[in-house]
Amino acid sequence: EQKVSLRDYERTGIDVDGIVTSQLLINIFEHNTPLHDGAVIIQGNRVVSATCYLPLSDNLGLSKELGTRHRAGVGISEITDSLTIIVSEETGKISVAYEGELERNLDADSLRDRMHKILNNPVEEHKNLRIWKGRSRDKK
């Protein structure tokens, strides 16, 4: 969330009000958990709600291979100034939706650079920002 409030969309989900950490995000998006489906809304450094419903884009120019998650990410970016990060459930690939445009298949450095550019934050201020990844199912 930036200047345009996402409060109406927050209300469609479950209040969380927790500091953004990799552990929290991993737990939210773990399969077969109550918070798994839907969007997470972040304000500043806090996860404010999870399992939120977002409006789907009706942009006919979007690839037919994109599913609901990507269409919702683009949809919310078409009607608000939010930066939307989408992680494919099938492939784990990262996309960013902003102002109705979708950038796909970003690596961690590209995502970090894109976030800083959109949010007008110099990269130097957030050198320790790390992109979270789910734990490997092969490791014990």
Language-model-derived ranges and their functions:
Residues 1-140:
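Divalent-cation
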